[in-house]
């Protein structure tokens, strides 16, 4: 809730907002889309993807002292993976018919991040 409150405050002031979060459920995406629609801003979803073994290897190298994430353990990753709901742009558009939406999928399997690339894009 605090994340959405802060985004609302920025948007209210005419600024842009990036909500950096693991939106694994469509209901969270709906909340963010509603904010963008309220302030007539384009809503961009940046979804990252890479092979499971790459993700788990990265998680294994993380430590609580050096990294802020909700996926600090293999189990946390697996839990998020199980709960993940496919991004449904049609649903977001039905709820916010005047909202411009872009969904980007970024392949993050390679290191360093400069080697990441957009592997998919859909606009509504």
What spans do the regions from the language model cover?
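Glycine-rich phosphate-binding loop used to anchor ATP phosphates in small-molecule kinases
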Residues: 1-44
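Alpha-helical elements of Rossmann-like donor-binding domains used by nucleotide-donor carbohydrate transfer enzymes
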Residues: 2, 31, 79, 83, ...
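A general structural signal marking secondary-structure boundaries and capping sites
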Residues: 7, 14, 66, 88-91
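Conserved beta-strand segments of the P-loop GTPase G domain that flank and frequently precede/overlap
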Residues: 19-20, 46-49, 104-107
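Conserved nucleotide-binding/hydrolysis micro-motifs of P-loop NTPases
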Residues: 23-25, 49-55, 110-113
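Short, glycine/charged-enriched secondary-structure capping and boundary segments
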Residues: 31-35, 59-62, 120
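A glycine- and Lys/Arg-enriched "phosphate-lid" helix/loop adjacent to the NTP-binding pocket
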Residues: 38-87
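NTP-dependent small-molecule kinase module
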Residues: 57, 82-124
